[in-house]
UniProtKB/Swiss-Prot annotation:
It comes from Saccharolobus islandicus (strain Y.N.15.51 / Yellowstone #2) (Sulfolobus islandicus). The gene is srp54. Belongs to the GTP-binding SRP family. SRP54 subfamily. Its EC number is 3.6.5.4. GO terms for cellular component: signal recognition particle. InterPro entries: AAA+_ATPase, P-loop_NTPase, Signal_recog_part_SRP54_M_sf, Signal_recog_particl_SRP54_hlx, Signal_recog_particle_SRP54_M, SRP/SRP_N, SRP54, SRP54_GTPase_dom. This is Signal recognition particle 54 kDa protein. GTP binds at residues 103-110, 185-189, 245-248.
Amino acid sequence: MLENIRDAVRKFLTRSTPYEKAVDEFIKELQKSLISSDVNVKLVFSLTAKIKERLNKEKPPSVLERKEWFISIVYDELSKLFGGDKEPNVNPTKLPFIIMLVGVQGSGKTTTAGKLAYFYKRRGYKVGLVAADVYRPAAYDQLLQLGNQIGVPVYGEPNNQNAIEIAKKGVDTFVKNKMDIIIVDTAGRHGYGEETKLLEEMKEIYEALKPDDVILVIDASIGQKAYDLASRFHQASPIGSIIITKMDGTAKGGGALSAVAATGATIKFIGTGEKIDELEIFNAKRYVSRILGMGDIESILEKVKGLEEYEKIQKKMEDVMEGKGKLTLRDVYAQIMALRKMGPLSKVLQHIPGLGVMLPTPSEDQLKLGEEKIRRWLAALNSMTYKELENPSIIDKSRMRRIAEGSGLEVEDVRELLEWYNNMNKLLKMVKRRRGSIDKLFGGKIG
């Protein structure tokens, strides 16, 4: 059902419906789609309330149309719903690195063990699998088959019913064989609703193995029921993370993801299909981009990214005005690149000083002149060394000639850029702490 949101985004951005009406219709469709995906109703209405609150309190930056700005807010708040900026660390912190997988029966735990082994093997690690699920007769055979498929050794004792003993012996064997990563597939004999027994077993094996990571495997089809299981697991195992499987085969994936994210637990991977390589590192923003339709929102996100980068440079300039540091040509390059991401050249040029296009409505000739000057400056900057970008004072006539030749420009073009840069630094020192000076300097505030 989350695919409906993608259609809603496309309609919202392309139809000529009045803005306020279009916003109301979109929010209703968003609520409907999320609830249909088994996202908790309270979470849904909290999300849309935050979106409306931001619409009322914030003003759109000039580089975004109102509809684009609205979608950027939806993107931001949906990303928070599914975990925000939390970036899972999938790299082992030491070698050997022991991973213990736990999960209820039917969650796809054993298949995930194989996928995880393949993931790390492709990254150049020596991986071993331990079959310690003694309650499901086919578990060992399944893991052995997966291991053979991907060329990863599997340790198991089909006639031994002591899971802890198998786990310890398997880990010891692979440590002696100098394996980098050891993945232990534990018992999954309890169904949903029997989390207490599952967690008790997890603790017993954990105490015996002292693994470096404990990963809970959850089937996406349980939707928002994942909250209770993930919450109890997160409390019982502070080092634990979570893998959500079968995201491709259920409409409740959004419910499971949002439920787990609400607990504060880290979602490390999601399973996106049956194939051995269909396990991907979970990134909330990338997931939301898919929901909203990457092609439809890519240009919006690019503008927002440009604005964020510009604001970083603006902060640097404010520091320079207060006598902290100096603006470098690397900063100038970053500033121009950030502004270019923000949209039409007519808007970009109005925010760059010294290009002769500071009028509210530059003429076509002025725009062409400014565009050509930006092109030449970027070519010159791209031909400079790291030291030259960081310390332009070392650029003498000989270096100017080299930069000009490397960029296909005249020496005068390079000299013009350096003169503009020097004048910029002088001006920044002159205005110092005067509030608003930086906005005047750059032709008006962007954000």
